[in-house]
Amino acid sequence: MFTQIAKNMQFKMPLRPLLFVCAIGLFFSSCQKDASSEPKDLIDIETRNAAWTKLSIPGQLRGTSAIFGNIDDTLVVATMYKIYMTTDKGASWQMVSDAGLGIPSFSMYQGELMALSNFQDHSTSPFLFSLDHGKSWSTKGKYGYEVYDKVRVNRKETKISENESYKIIPQPNEIIDKEYGRPLAQPDKLARVTDRGEQLLDFPFRRQLNYIYHDKKNRLYIGAEGTRFEWSIKGNERTYPTSTDTAIIYISKLPISAH
């Protein structure tokens, strides 16, 4: 009888702690389920635009500074000092050169791709050269000064015909912050330029734009920074615009036809 009582006590004593452990287990299981049911990443609505494809390279403080090639084959992009390329439409990026010097433009001459070094609206002075469409780079070019001294690329305007071009239009800082009384920077715009003048495009993204380019299919490529033209608040500090470390490339899904 004593043995039977002892057995009953051994069974009954752990029951309440056991129920407590089970309750804790169910609680954490519920938390894990709720956490896993939430989306890990917020959806970037810019990637759902019907007219533009958006590509991003994270970890780039200065944004996209130069573009060459095309999205269907090989696209070469500079993010100020570094050169990246993609052959899978932006699904992955390979860094192919760390130039140590800012790259404002690319230019191609008879199979030689050149990285330029002058950050004027018209970039000049090639200093890096590639004979395999950007896969590898050298400081020694194939040609001489008689070729390289003539290289000029307008990084803010791309001409698709004799009478038609597309350009980046900086916007004046006309909006005044009520609290600090200073003008606020505004996002750049795009315009179509013909002999009839300039016409603003319906470009839906509020960004600082660094570069404009078109490929052989007359698709526009826009190099931009991740800067957002909105206030960010951290403690007692307010910052405008809000910087992010992302290089962005916008590509028109349809060609722009020359008229």
What is each PLM-predicted segment?
Residues 2-19:
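Bacterial N-terminal signal peptides that target proteins for export
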Residues 32-259:
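Extracellular glycan-interacting surfaces
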Residues 27-30:
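C-terminal motif of bacterial Sec signal peptides marking the signal peptidase cleavage site
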